[in-house]
Amino acid sequence: YSYLYTTELLCAYEEEYDYLNDYPYFHILSLGCGGCADLMAFEHFYRMHSFVAPISYIGIDVNELWRPINNRTLKYCENNGINYKVRYADVFKCFRQHIVNDTNVIVISYLISYLYNTNQIGVIDSFLEDLVTNIVQKKNKGQKLLLIINDVNSYKRGRTYFSQFIRKLEKYKLSIIKCTYKYFDTGDLFDGQKIGTPHLVKRSLFSIPEAIQRKYHAESNCKKTIQLMLEVV
């Protein structure tokens, strides 16, 4: 699914081009980073628009099976001037003990559905509390921050919890200057799944090699995914 995940997040970055255009640097924090599809998408977006601001990336994931892929990504980043780190830790415990300063892009992709699927959805409120107090509030005063939530367009498993991000930011008097919902229209959505406006993209924006398609039965059609982009100052 890396091709589709990268496509989804590239669409999110493109939606936020005007907001990101004058960033003096990009300090990306990815919660539940996996194979870092969000960084792949960002690097493509960055090159497409000829950005020159420095990039740093911190990924957090509990699953060390991603390590071989992350190690290859590290080598690529070292050769291309990207400061890249991955920490293998439980996201939901990590920020009770650690503060991250000056982050200005936060990506949370398929983390809510992971909580639901593993019967941990009850921790979402405390997770959001830690996210806001130990990460979002630690940005520089007046600094722009983009929060991207990308998840399953399904009741309870994804979009149901998006509004909690907004309420938690408002609780701590952070200013949300823009709130954007986007979804991928698979042609068979219920009205309740059509929140915001659809992306025009229907298929992977990246060519999937035939060998990978055969070996992994890789699909190129976009899935039922919904996104919330929050511009915060």
Where are these regions (language model features)?
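Class I SAM-dependent methyltransferase Rossmann-like catalytic core
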Residues: 1-20
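Conserved class I S-adenosyl-L-methionine
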Residues: 24-34
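Domain-level detector for long C-terminal conserved domains
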Residues: 66, 77-78, 88-233
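A short helix-to-beta-strand connector/capping loop
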Residues: 53-55, 78-85
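Active-site catalytic pocket residues across diverse enzymes, especially alpha/beta-hydrolases
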Residues: 14, 46-50, 74-77, 119
